[in-house]
Amino acid sequence: MSKSIWVAIGSVFGLLFILFGCAEVIQVGTTVGQGMGQISKEDKEKIDRLALQTEKAIRPMNEQEEYYVGRAVAATILGQYRLYRNEKLTRYLNEVGQALALSSSRPFTYGGYHFAVLDADEVNALACPGGIIFISRGMLKKAQNEEEVAAILAHEIAHVSHKDGLGAIQSARWAEVVTALGTEAARKLSGADLAKLVSLFEGSVNDVAKTLLVNGYSREQESAADLSALSYMNRIGYDPNALADYLEKLAREQRAGANKGFFGTHPGMQDRLSNAKSLIAEKKWTPAGHPERNRRFQQFFPFS
């Protein structure tokens, strides 16, 4: 095939791929090209194979991959924190959290949602990709009722639903991982190649862990998680005002000068509070009393 024809075909197929991002589109084009006698069967197979490899290399992480990255991130977190061993509290959090997850925009993940308490006085909450969520003792101690516990959990579920943790992984790094895993050669990796793949995977995990523990999410991501959390809460009868109440406590501490730890990775608490209040007012969500939830909170919550 002449160079000019290759350039022309490559340009057309490249444009189709950019517009539609689908290897099947390229395969339709090569079938037409072969039928018109413009390309040979061998050339068609080469182009189709290249398109499929390109699609795999730029595809997002699938649910199973997200699950394994999330597990590794959780292990990294547990290398820095101990779990708070209170079976009754953990079961209680999981009951509330599972109900909220079902009301979210992503009710099911590959490995499911799991909630646990970190044995730490600091205020913190960490949502790993795939649905493993940690809440510190210090964070829970500030909750005065089940509605506020639900607000904390709903916010973290929103981060999982939005896949915010995955956004921390450098795109170039993940493209290398996918390319390595997607090749026939991956089945016969040498020791050096396997070491590189492990290093790339660890780098992806470290990208997420660094965002959760050091850098934090952007203000836009935090505010978006708040707004989604309000909707999740409202859908199953929790009072969305509880999130505003909890944010008010955090904003008050931030105004008083708190700027380390959680407050260092979660700036702009006052803006988040204002955004939450605006949505609550717009939706006309009003507080609703649920005495049975207060009784349950008193029964299972050791910090009240």
Q: What name fits each language-model region?
A:
Residues G10-L19:
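Bacterial N-terminal signal peptides
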